[in-house]
């Protein structure tokens, strides 16, 4: 189950009132990319893709956490009955289905870690999981970024970027470009899209 676009935006506004930051505009950019790519694929629901892109980082509502935003987002969406959004909160950080590739601090309790590992192990990825992983790697707070620039930015901030995850993001880009038969940056309006202010 998923909220509507308007309900999802209300959740983002509420999240930003609790924890303001660039994650809001990053989420808008991810949602924009997801909607455009899904529409260009022809066999995906663009509205669903938009909502999933918008809510992938909703765990940031609860404060500045690294791995914790994954468990916070998953638990929050499950609590509201939005299981499809909860799945994306979990899967967007793990391209290769392993917690070992997470970039950032493992700032979770033993219970949260167990939940992430358990749910991740039982999760089967689909094209929506893959799409939001890609869009997370394209989305900056200021707009659509070159995927390699975005990964280098993350590498600079955290000091490393796992090669497996880097390679996976490049494969995702190729996968969706092949599916669309179009350039990802043209579809996502890289040179013109700017996320709106969230008020």
Region roles according to the model:
Residues 1-8, 48:
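Acidic-glycine-rich active-site phosphate/pyrophosphate-binding loop
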Residues 5-19:
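Generic N-terminal amphipathic, Lys/Arg-enriched alpha-helix
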Residues 7, 101, 157, 164:
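Active-site helical microenvironments for divalent-metal-assisted chemistry
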Residues 13-16, 40-154:
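Divalent metal-dependent catalytic cores for phosphoryl transfer on phosphate-bearing substrates
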Residues 22-24:
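A short, charge-rich alpha-helical start-of-domain segment used by transcription regulators
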Residues 160-199:
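Charged phosphate-binding loop/patch that engages nucleotide di/tri-phosphates or the phosphate backbone
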């Amino acid at each position: 189950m998923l909220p509507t676009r308007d309900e999802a935006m209300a959740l983002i506004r509420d999240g930003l009132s609790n924890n303001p930051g660039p994650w809001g505009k990053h989420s808008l950019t991810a949602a924009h990319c997801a909607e455009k790519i899904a529409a260009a694929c022809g066999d995906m629901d663009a509205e669903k893709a938009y909502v999933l892109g918008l809510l992938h980082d909703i765990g940031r509502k609860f404060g500045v956490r690294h791995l914790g935003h994954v468990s916070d987002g998953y638990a929050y969406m499950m609590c509201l009955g939005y299981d499809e959004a909860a799945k994306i909160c979990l899967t967007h950080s793990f391209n290769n289905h392993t917690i070992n590739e997470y970039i950032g601090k493992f700032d979770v309790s033993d219970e949260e870690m167990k939940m992430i590992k358990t749910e991740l192990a039982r999760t089967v990825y689909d094209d929506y999981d893959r799409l939001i992983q890609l869009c997370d790697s394209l989305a900056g707070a200021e707009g659509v970024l070159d995927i390699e620039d975005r990964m280098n930015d993350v590498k600079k901030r955290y000091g490393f970027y796992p090669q497996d995850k880097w390679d996976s993001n490049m494969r995702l880009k190729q996968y969706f470009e092949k599916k669309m038969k179009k350039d990802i940056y043209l579809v996502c309006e890289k040179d013109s899209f700017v996320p709106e202010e969230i008020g």
